[in-house]
């Protein structure tokens, strides 16, 4: 769905080659689209973990971002009607987008706990943070401000406690919204 981008397998092969050459790599899993769910994230994170110990940078799609319309157009041209419908809902309803983005952030962090040596650094959008309050806003702000743990940085590489799921496995995030 990314116009002019190399296929995912080509990107993965390039990352694998770099990793094998001893170059520290990170993966941008950004942006993720609303039809993506737990199984999709598990598959992606499995590929990324196969590269070794990597940092995955994650951000749900933002309907205000420049690439949103490109993705919508690409989905329409590819005939992905279910994706088009979902993206339209994300674009048309602020509350729908907030709930979708929170669910995506939470699901990715939950799935990431299944993989040793895989750090996911989430990027909640400023508008998402502003659209929340209380404990949830505090948690999202902490996630935003956490330093990503790339091993080539001068900071220790332990996973940041701020970069964790919003709710535990099987627990709904509805009580936080």
Q: Where would I find each of the regions flagged by the language model?
A:
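Conserved AdoMet/S-adenosylmethionine-binding subsite of the radical SAM
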Residues: 1-100
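C-terminal accessory extensions appended to soluble enzyme cores
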Residues: 71-177
């Amino acid at each position: 769905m990314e116009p002019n981008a190399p296929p995912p397998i080509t990107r993965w092969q390039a990352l694998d080659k770099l990793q094998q050459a001893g170059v520290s790599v990170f993966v941008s899993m950004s942006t993720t689209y609303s039809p993506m769910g737990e199984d999709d994230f598990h598959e992606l994170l499995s590929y990324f973990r196969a590269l070794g110990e990597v940092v995955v940078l994650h951000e749900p799609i933002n309907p205000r971002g420049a690439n949103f319309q490109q993705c919508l157009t690409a989905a329409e041209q590819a005939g992905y009607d279910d994706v088009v419908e979902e993206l339209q809902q994300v674009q048309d309803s602020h509350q729908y987008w907030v709930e979708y983005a929170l669910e995506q952030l939470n699901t990715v962090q939950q799935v990431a706990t299944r993989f040793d040596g895989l750090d996911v650094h989430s990027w909640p959008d400023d508008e998402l943070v502003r659209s929340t309050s209380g404990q949830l806003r505090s948690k999202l702000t902490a996630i935003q401000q956490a330093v990503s743990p790339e091993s080539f940085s001068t900071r220790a590489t332990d996973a940041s406690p701020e970069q964790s799921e919003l709710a535990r496995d099987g627990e709904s995030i509805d009580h936080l919204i």
